[in-house]
């Protein structure tokens, strides 16, 4: 067989039956000749591919050729060549197509993994996962929150704090007797506890003010509280201005729950003085204590009276931020309900009682049970929602951006005034010619030493005069 002539001459099989073609294919090994043969005889009905014995019984419908994967659509020169095999068991193989974005594994937050991008989503950069990164870092670091409770004794401050955070912060507290309370002054005590819930750690610090408002003369009893808040601002300012700023502990007071007695007709003078003295330093949230001693109409009346007096005396309590336009209606309604509940009428209890076949935290009276977490009985749930679930971060932001910045600006202004005053004093000293103070001649020196000292004094005076003349000429020239 002359292979140099291709399919010319004797290269074409004379027997074109199926058996003859099969024998010819078995004897021929050149792929180019096989391809040319298949092309020349593709229209012949008697030419069948040697895949199966029953091919002749099938309808003559061309079988679709497997498509190449989309992986090579953008770069056609790298498409692998497809060549028919010269054997009876001829098969075609293709690489599986890459997974689509919908079929690829997803990250735990429902986003596509930016490190597993393929050709079909090459426009996906991955910065959409930045909130997830911030979330992981914040959860790993934990959160700090400092809460101050203020008010006279017997209003349920400790009980309410324990009810809010489901912990006992005052297990080591010792109650003072009546005689000890007579000479008691306002103290500042701190209770710190680490709380973890679903992997989120919170370091809670409770600042209590025992002795506040318990004396007969309560003049300026709020000063220790104001000084404590300023001290925390000062300490944070020093740490922030120092060299080591990596591990700054934030002890600034983020919120102050001020308890108002339910037995008055509104705000007392002490309440007004306290809130006016601290409203520029801390976020004040007024609390109407022991709401179970009042009827629902009395609660509404006292709330309205307290709000009017707060506005009348110009007291700036914590203002809830406005809702964004993209917030859902449920959140807007919840926020509006929180704003209308100021001051929060609360009840605290660490006792679990049985009510209607279920165990709840509340207080048992002869006429019924007051449930702490029942919105129809008090505002405890609303206070907890505001303080922990919805506005804790905003309380910290207002403390940092408003109250601390005001204190920091005052410190910088005071430091600037001191520097300017010192510069002015030095300038006057230079102009008066006393830059180099001349020491007095010590008594008991010999005449030669006195003469030498006086000569040096005269030389210093001449040098000062020359220096002043040079400065005067420079001012005139410029």
From Swiss-Prot:
The modification Phosphoserine is found at residues 117-118, 325, 432. Residues 208-211 are annotated as: G3 motif. GTP binds at residues 151-158, 185, 290-298, 348, 363. Septins polymerize into heterooligomeric protein complexes that form filaments, and can associate with cellular membranes, actin filaments and microtubules. GTPase activity is required for filament formation. Interacts with SEPTIN8. Component of a septin core octameric complex consisting of SEPTIN12, SEPTIN7, SEPTIN6 and SEPTIN2 or SEPTIN4 in the order 12-7-6-2-2-6-7-12 or 12-7-6-4-4-6-7-12. Interacts with SEPTIN14 (via C-terminus). Interacts with DYRK1A. Phosphorylated by DYRK1A. Ubiquitinated by AREL1. Residues 13-26 have a biased composition (Basic and acidic residues). Residues 447-478 form a coiled coil. Keywords: Cell cycle, Cell division, Cell projection, Cilium, Coiled coil, Cytoplasm, Cytoplasmic vesicle, Differentiation, Flagellum, GTP-binding, Mitochondrion, Nucleotide-binding, Nucleus, Phosphoprotein, Spermatogenesis, Synapse, Ubl conjugation. Filament-forming cytoskeletal GTPase. Pro-apoptotic protein involved in LGR5-positive intestinal stem cell and Paneth cell expansion in the intestines, via its interaction with XIAP. May also play a role in the regulation of cell fate in the intestine. Positive regulator of apoptosis involved in hematopoietic stem cell homeostasis; via its interaction with XIAP. Negative regulator of repair and hair follicle regeneration in response to injury, due to inhibition of hair follicle stem cell proliferation, potentially via its interaction with XIAP. It holds the Pfam family Septin. Widely expressed in adult and fetal tissues with highest expression in adult brain (at protein level), heart, liver and adrenal gland and fetal heart, kidney, liver and lung. Expressed in presynaptic terminals of dopaminergic neurons projecting from the substantia nigra pars compacta to the striatum (at protein level). Expressed in axonal varicosities in dopaminergic nerve terminals (at protein level). Expressed in the putamen and in the adjacent cerebral cortex (at protein level). Expressed in colonic crypts (at protein level). Also expressed in colorectal cancers and malignant melanomas. CDD domains: CDC_Septin. Residues 151-158 are annotated as: G1 motif. It comes from Homo sapiens (Human). GO terms for molecular function: GTP binding; GTPase activity; identical protein binding; magnesium ion binding; molecular adaptor activity; structural molecule activity. Residues 1-115, 428-448 are annotated as: Disordered. One of its GO terms (cellular component) is sperm annulus. This is Septin-4.
């Amino acid at each position: 067989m002359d292979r140099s002539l291709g399919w010319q001459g004797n290269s074409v099989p004379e027997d074109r039956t199926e058996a003859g073609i099969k024998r010819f294919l078995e004897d021929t090994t050149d792929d180019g000749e096989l391809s040319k043969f298949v092309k020349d005889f593709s229209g012949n009905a008697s030419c069948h591919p040697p895949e199966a014995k029953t091919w002749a019984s099938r309808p003559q419908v061309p079988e679709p050729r497997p498509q190449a994967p989309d992986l090579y659509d953008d770069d056609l020169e790298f498409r692998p060549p497809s060549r028919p095999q010269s054997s009876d068991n001829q098969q075609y193989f293709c690489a599986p197509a890459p997974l689509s974005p919908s079929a690829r594994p997803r990250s735990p937050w429902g986003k596509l993994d930016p490190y597993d991008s393929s050709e079909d989503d090459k426009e996906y950069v991955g910065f959409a996962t930045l909130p997830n990164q911030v979330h992981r870092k914040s959860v790993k670091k934990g959160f700090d929150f400092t809460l101050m409770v203020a008010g006279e004794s017997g209003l349920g401050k400790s009980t309410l704090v324990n009810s809010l955070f489901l912990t006992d912060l005052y297990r080591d507290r010792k109650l003072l007797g009546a005689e000890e309370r007579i000479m008691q002054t306002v103290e500042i005590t701190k209770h710190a506890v680490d709380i973890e819930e679903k992997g989120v750690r919170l370091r809670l610090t409770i600042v209590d003010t025992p002795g506040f408002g318990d004396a007969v003369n309560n003049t300026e009893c709020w000063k220790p509280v104001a000084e404590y808040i300023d001290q925390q601002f000062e300490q944070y300012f020093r740490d922030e201005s120092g060299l080591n700023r990596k591990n700054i502990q934030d002890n600034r007071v983020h919120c102050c729950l001020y308890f108002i007695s339910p037995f008055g007709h509104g705000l007392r003078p002490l309440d007004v003085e306290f809130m006016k003295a601290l409203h520029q330093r801390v976020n004040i949230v007024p609390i109407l204590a022991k709401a179970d001693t009042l009827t629902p109409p009395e609660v509404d009346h006292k709330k309205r009276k307290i709000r009017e007096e707060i506005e009348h005396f110009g007291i700036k309590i914590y203002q809830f931020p406005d809702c964004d336009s993209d917030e859902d209606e449920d959140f807007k309604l919840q926020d509006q309900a929180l704003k209308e509940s100021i001051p929060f009428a609360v009840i605290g209890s660490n006792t679990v009682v049985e009510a209607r076949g279920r165990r709840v935290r509340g207080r048992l009276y002869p006429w019924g049970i007051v449930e702490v977490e029942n919105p129809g009985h008090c505002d405890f749930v609303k206070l907890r929602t505001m303080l922990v679930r919805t506005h804790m971060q905003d309380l910290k932001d207002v403390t940092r951006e408003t109250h601390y910045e005001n204190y920091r600006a005052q410190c910088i202004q005071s430091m600037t005034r001191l520097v300017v005053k010192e510069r002015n004093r030095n300038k006057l000293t230079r102009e008066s010619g006393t830059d180099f103070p001349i020491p007095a001649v010590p008594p008991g020196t010999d005449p030669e030493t006195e003469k030498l000292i006086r000569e040096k004094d005269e030389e210093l005076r001449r040098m000062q005069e020359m220096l002043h003349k040079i400065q005067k000429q420079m001012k005139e020239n410029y």
